[in-house]
């Protein structure tokens, strides 16, 4: 197996970015978290624009347009730091990620000169408008139309978008429409254009602090100069953005899970029951260890893919790997937040405790960027037994990533890897039986695996976590 990127072998400049992001988070975001959740007017935008002063909103934008032009690893570091509040994370991501990347990759020189400096300094807020009421993961089913005017100077857009992050804040939307009802095309649409109307704020289960609205387009005249890329080639832009979005669920899952684990460790060490702290209970140690193991696996998986993308310089060649990260990471963080609430007991169900917010926020990530069900189909390309085949591929890739990383680290990483291996083998075996049952064949007979004392491994991992009070490898 080839060498791969891990968080332990990041460069000095990456560690510097991590420190800067952490300092910004502590000084500028944490004091405003409650106000962000309440959507107090101006607070979220104010924090976002302060992040622009440090270059975070222009992290991927070329320097000549006022950005930092940092590599993908740097972007992931910032995403992981900001993941401690998903509302702020998705707001920042819509600005610095899917709001800017299509323009960076596919924009004309004139478009870049006009818009990128304003996106970099956050004087202009960006949003990405693809989803429609009848077209979610099936993006090619959109109905928004774009018709060229007789003089050839404008496209007239008509349609409705929904679930638009930053929808109520944005000044510039990347809108997808079908030219003549057929040619899937991207447009740069300014909010100031007549006929552009954001809808009311949606009332969501989670992400309470972020702006999510519909977008209505009523005879909107968009200059032909604002076609992004080529007419009929908008799917390339959309799918590249989806791949990046799927990959970014990796750092979200790790950042959120680390915070929930730290909160759970602190609570378990303080909460007493039957004369002792609940951290001494085997059932609680089991949960804490499993939370850490999932963090290690997701961390190993997504950093490996980041390294592969940086070496390949093209994300389109790693679309399946991005889908694997999306599925594995979103399901891992779902487990972690659920166990975090369980460790907190009744307090975990109360809004005064942060784990309640993490629990609500995490649920969307199995739906974002294409549902996990559709991503499994994309991984396997086999409709009949696609889910089982995808699960085998995901578990194998995650296990291999963890093993590659553990080879570079000490015995504690080996312990976590042993648990990952044990669980992956069980899931692969179950998926294999499902495939053979569906096809009416007998699964191969394999010799029994060597027994693994998973209870002892979990106790050992949990004790190390409790001693440190946080996630450690």
Model-derived regions, located:
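A short, Trp-centered hydrophobic/proline-enriched beta-strand micro-motif
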Residues: 122-130
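Alpha-helical interface subdomain recognition
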Residues: 1-84, 89, 106-111, 118-123, ...
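A short core secondary-structure module
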Residues: 153-198
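Short glycine/proline-enriched turns and hinge-like loops at secondary-structure junctions
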Residues: 70, 138-140, 166-170, 208-210, ...
């Amino acid at each position: 197996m080839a060498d791969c990127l891990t968080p332990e072998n990041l460069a000095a400049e990456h560690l510097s970015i991590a420190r800067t992001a952490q300092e910004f988070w502590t000084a500028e975001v944490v004091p405003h978290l409650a106000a962000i959740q309440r959507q107090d007017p101006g607070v979220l935008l104010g924090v976002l624009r302060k992040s622009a002063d440090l270059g975070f909103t222009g992290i991927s934008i070329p320097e000549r347009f006022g950005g930092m032009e940092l590599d993908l690893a740097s972007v992931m570091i910032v995403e992981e730091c900001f993941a401690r509040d998903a509302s702020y994370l998705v707001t920042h991501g819509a600005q610095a990620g899917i709001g800017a990347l299509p323009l960076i990759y596919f924009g004309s020189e004139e478009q870049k000169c006009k818009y990128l400096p304003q996106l970099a300094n956050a004087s202009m807020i960006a949003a990405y408008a693809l989803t429609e009421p009848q077209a979610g993961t099936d993006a090619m089913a959109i109905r928004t139309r774009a018709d060229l005017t007789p003089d050839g100077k404008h496209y007239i857009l008509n349609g409705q978008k929904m679930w638009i992050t930053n929808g109520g804040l944005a000044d510039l939307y990347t809108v997808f429409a079908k030219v003549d009802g057929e040619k899937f095309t991207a447009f740069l649409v300014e909010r100031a254009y007549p006929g552009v109307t954001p809808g009311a704020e949606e009332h969501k289960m989670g992400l309470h602090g972020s702006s999510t609205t519909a977008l209505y387009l009523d005879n909107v005249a968009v200059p032909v100069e604002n076609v992004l890329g080529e007419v009929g080639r908008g799917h390339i832009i959309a799918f590249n953005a989806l791949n990046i979005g799927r990959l970014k669920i990796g750092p979200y899952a790790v950042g959120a899970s680390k915070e929930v684990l730290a909160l759970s460790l602190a609570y378990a060490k303080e909460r007493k029951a039957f004369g002792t702290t609940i951290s001494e209970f085997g059932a609680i140690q089991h949960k804490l260890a499993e939370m850490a193991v999932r963090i290690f696996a997701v961390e190993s998986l997504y950093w490996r893919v980041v390294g592969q993308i940086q070496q390949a310089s093209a994300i389109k060649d790693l679309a399946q790997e991005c889908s694997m990260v999306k599925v594995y990471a979103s399901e891992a963080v779902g487990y972690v937040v659920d166990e975090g609430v369980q460790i907190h007991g009744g307090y975990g169900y109360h809004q005064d405790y942060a784990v309640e917010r993490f629990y609500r926020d995490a649920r969307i990530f199995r739906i974002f960027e294409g549902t996990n069900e559709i991503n499994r189909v994309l991984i396997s390309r086999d409709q009949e037994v696609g889910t089982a085949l995808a699960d085998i591929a995901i578990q194998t890739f995650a296990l291999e990533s963890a093993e590659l990383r553990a080879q570079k680290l000490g015995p504690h990483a080996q312990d976590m890897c042993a648990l990952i291996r044990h669980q992956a083998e069980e899931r692969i075996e179950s998926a294999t039986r499902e495939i053979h049952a569906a096809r009416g064949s007998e699964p191969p007979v394999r010799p029994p695996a060597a027994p693994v004392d998973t209870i002892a491994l979990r106790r050992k991992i949990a004790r190390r976590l409790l001693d440190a009070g946080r996630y450690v490898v």
